[in-house]
Regions:
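A short acidic-Thr-Gly-centered motif at the start of a beta-strand
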Residues: 4-14
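Domain-level signal for Mg2+-assisted phosphodiester chemistry and nucleotide/NA-binding surfaces
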Residues: 37-42
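Active-site rim beta-loop-alpha module in soluble metabolic enzymes
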Residues: 136-158
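Acidic/Gly/His-enriched mid-domain segments of enzyme catalytic cores or analogous surface patches
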Residues: 43-132
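Conserved beta-strand elements of the Class I
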Residues: 18-20, 62, 138
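A glycine-biased structural micro-motif
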Residues: 16-17, 91
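Short acidic, Gly/Ser-rich segments with clustered Asp/Glu that frequently serve as metal-coordination loops
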Residues: 11-12, 19-31
């Protein structure tokens, strides 16, 4: 099994094989907690306009995320796991957009399969990779705003 560690949006664009897009502190920790709170589905999108358009077409969807570290007006929740810890998300569909993590998911067009990575789901990722035994794994560290590498994402990949 070959493992490549890539960085930022350019890394996501070059990712192949089983791809783990890593955004430790916010996006994918929030995603893990959202599923833990009963969310049925998370739809990652690259930008605020797409998120709001999906909400307009599907008023029962919840919109979660941030732009420049701030909750966007009209969104149901920001991008911190603490924003959803007490929320009942049972059977909810969440539209999620962030400055880093969801942009990586959308950019990983050449991946065979894409999963999200964070410390909160690291053991599940390891078990999944062991089970799948892919010939190539790409670990994509999304960094701060998908433009500056950060230690926590790199540590998670290591």
């Amino acid at each position: 099994m070959e493992i490549k560690i890539l960085h930022l949006v350019e890394g996501a664009k070059n990712a192949k094989g089983l791809t783990v897009v890593i955004d430790v502190f916010r996006a994918f920790s929030l995603a893990a907690y959202a599923f833990g709170a009963g969310a049925k589905k998370i739809l990652p999108v690259a930008d605020v306009d797409t998120a709001l358009m999906l909400k307009e077409k599907n008023p029962h969807y919840l919109v979660v995320g941030e732009k420049k570290k701030q909750k966007v007006p009209g969104f149901d929740f920001g991008n911190s796991p603490s924003h959803i810890l007490k929320a009942d998300l049972t059977d909810k569909t969440i539209v999620h957009t962030t400055s880093a993590g969801t942009r990586g998911l959308v950019s990983a067009m050449h991946a065979d399969e894409i999963i999200t990575g964070s410390f909160v789901n690291a053991s599940a990722i390891i078990e999944y990779i062991k089970m799948k035994k892919p010939p190539l794994v790409s670990l994509v560290c999304m960094g701060y705003a998908a433009s500056i590498p950060v230690e926590e994402d790199t540590f998670c990949a290591d």
